[in-house]
């Protein structure tokens, strides 16, 4: 896609449980990206990253795309799309090949990556990414850039990400029904890491947590490479539900209260401050302490980060 000035444009879609986001960027002659359009629409057709109502999903995608097109003054035909959700699986793999010409080439790297995929995975899952963690040449570990190095045997430790075939196809179908060609599907937390993590952080070791509506997606880097990914089935919608239950207020109002007033620790709020909470039905609204709201939110996030900590502990890193 291109604009009237001849510059190339690209578009991306974040199809989440709570909202759909569309982003349009222009690539200038220096290969730099400049955001020129943005669209967002509430999502009601997904649950924990999986399409449960394709018509609602199509409508939300279409509205987000049209809004982005209007702001960017362009027509969007192709998109990069993120994927996440409870259907995502990940595990480690290992491949070994003989170096063909005595010096590692791209063909050798492609071959060892393919060899690492030679394992049994469930028939309802498809390999989305094979992410190299480490290369080994004739027993020498820790090789990051093997091309051009001499040796006889090349090994690769990789991290493999798979997605549900049906979940992926339903997301693709939703976009295609909006007249969009899907250029590439990418794991959400991997895409997020490109935006927010520096090379130093990846080298030293970092865990990125992308908290969505239905799930929280994590990716762990060490030594500059991805070493683990995980999807936690807890997200912002769970906080909204907790608020609705604890304060006895409708879910829509609970979401607004979360956005306007929520805090993740009760120590940060004024104990004297009150907020108005709508009641269920025709009952009059009530005044409650902001500290009470904070305690509800804090409990859920403490649970989330305890689960994340446990999962990291299981990763053997």
Task: Cite the ranges covered by each PLM segment.
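C-terminal catalytic subdomain
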Residues: 301
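ATP-binding/phosphotransfer module of carbohydrate and carboxylate kinases, centering on a glycine-rich
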Residues: 306-317
């Amino acid at each position: 896609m291109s604009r009237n000035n001849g510059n190339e444009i690209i578009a991306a879609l974040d199809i989440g449980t709570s909202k759909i986001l569309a982003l349009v960027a222009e690539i200038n002659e220096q290969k730099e990206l400049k955001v020129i359009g943005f669209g967002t629409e509430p999502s009601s057709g997904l649950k924990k990253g999986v399409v449960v109502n394709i018509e609602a999903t199509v409508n939300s995608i279409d509205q987000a795309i049209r809004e982005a097109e209007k702001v960017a003054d362009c027509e969007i035909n192709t998109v990069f799309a993120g994927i996440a959700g409870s259907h995502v699986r990940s595990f480690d793999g290992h491949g070994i090949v003989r170096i063909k010409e005595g010096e590692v080439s791209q063909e050798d790297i492609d071959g060892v990556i393919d060899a690492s995929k030679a394992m049994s995975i469930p028939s309802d899952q498809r390999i989305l990414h094979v992410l190299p963690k480490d290369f080994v040449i004739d027993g020498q570990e820790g090789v990051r850039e093997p091309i051009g190095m001499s040796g006889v045997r090349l090994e690769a430790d990789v991290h493999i990400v798979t997605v549900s075939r049906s979940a992926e196809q339903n997301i693709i179908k939703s976009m295609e029904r909006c007249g969009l060609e899907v250029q590439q599907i990418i794991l959400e937390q991997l895409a997020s890491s490109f935006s927010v993590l520096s090379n130093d952080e990846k080298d030293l070791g970092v865990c990125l947590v992308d908290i969505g509506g239905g799930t929280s997606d994590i990716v762990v880097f060490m030594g500059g490479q991805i070493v683990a990914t995980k999807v936690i089935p807890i997200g912002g919608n769970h906080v909204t539900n907790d608020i609705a239950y604890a304060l006895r207020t409708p879910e829509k109002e609970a979401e607004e209260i979360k956005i306007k007033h929520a805090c993740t620790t009760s120590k940060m709020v004024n104990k004297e401050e009150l907020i108005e909470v709508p009641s269920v039905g025709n009952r009059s609204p009530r005044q409650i302490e902001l500290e009470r709201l904070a305690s509800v939110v804090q409990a859920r996030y403490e649970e989330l980060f305890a689960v994340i900590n446990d999962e990291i502990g299981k990763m053997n890193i």
